Every structure is written in C-alpha cells, then in structure tokens.
Amino acid sequence: MSLLDHKFGQGGIVVSQLEDVLNWARLSSLFPMSFGLACCAIEMMQTFTSGYDLDRFGVIPRPSPRQSDVMIVAGTVTFKMADRIRRLYEQMPEPRYVISMGSCSNCGGPYWEHGYHVVKGVDRIVPVDIYVPGCPPRPEALIGGFLKLQEKIRKETLVAPKAVERFLETHAKEKNIA
C-alpha cells in the first residue's frame, strides 16, 4: 500500500492548492522568445541545441512574442533598439518574465562609461526577473537562469497584492457610478 493510499484511502483524491497546480504548469512549460543582439546570442543559440536539451526542463523556444512568456535579452542594447524591446515586451501575454543575459544587457558591459549609444542595462526599459552574468555567459549559466526562474515561478501567488488593490479601487469606482 502506497503512502497516498494510506493517507487518502481508496477514493483516489489528491488535495492541492490551485496556486500550486498553476505554478507547476507555468514552470513546466516556459516558452522563451530570444532577442539576440550581439555575441551573447551565439551562446544563447548554442543553449537551444540538442547538446543541452532544454526540452527536458519544459523550455521550448517560440518565434513570436504573442506565443512567449519569457523574453531573453542577450547582448548590447542600444537606444535605437530600446523601443523595439519595449514593444515586444508589451505584446507578450501575462504572466511574462525577462532574463537579461550577459554583461552588456545587465549593465552596459564594456560600453557603460563611454558608450553614448548604449542603454546602461535593459532593466531601464523592461522589468528584469533574472540576471545571467558573464561576457558572454556559458550555456550552463543560461540554463541556471532558467532554473532560477522556475524557482521564482514556484513561489508566486495567484493574485499579487497590487492586483487586489487595483481591483478594489475599480470596484469602488463602479459602485460610485451606479
């Protein structure tokens, strides 16, 4: 007799929270959209080859932002590209996550001091969830970033406190109108 049979009897019922089930589904099916801008993109492409087999983690690359829930920004972000990155981020469905890969996208890299054309970190454009350090980071580092993102998703709650506040404010406004 297994532990579950002993605990729940013969009914075959497993008790869980909805948050746990949704988070498990989210972390088990990450669909990244790659946004490669420089030499970090080569390492990112290598990470998606069969040698590293990201499918076993549930990570399957998608070509469109509308099908993705993770954006990987890899490389030097210039001011000309900033608007495009923001637009692609806004096209992604919620919940959406961003991985910043490499020194250039994290903080401007070697161009941070004298490069007038370089954004000093992609976090000035879009909110970043995971930073992967390195110049360029190895594929193992990006895999580690995906694992950290999965841990972050596992700990998420179904409703964020700000969303609750926004709902209550909207509900109060609707009450005043009616």
From Swiss-Prot:
Name of the featured protein: NADH-quinone oxidoreductase subunit B 1
Catalytic activity, EC: 7.1.1.-
Residues annotated for [4Fe-4S] cluster binding in this entry: 39-40, 104, 135
Membrane topology: Peripheral membrane protein
Species the sequence originates in: Cytophaga hutchinsonii (strain ATCC 33406 / DSM 1761 / CIP 103989 / NBRC 15051 / NCIMB 9469 / D465)
Family to which this protein belongs: Belongs to the complex I 20 kDa subunit family.
Cofactor binding mode and count: Binds 1 [4Fe-4S] cluster.
UniProt subunit comment: NDH-1 is composed of 14 different subunits. Subunits NuoB, C, D, E, F, and G constitute the peripheral sector of the complex.
Catalytic activity entry: a quinone + NADH + 5 H(+)(in) = a quinol + NAD(+) + 4 H(+)(out)
GO molecular function, one term: 4 iron, 4 sulfur cluster binding
Subcellular location field: Cell inner membrane
Enzyme class: translocase
Pfam family, one: Oxidored_q6
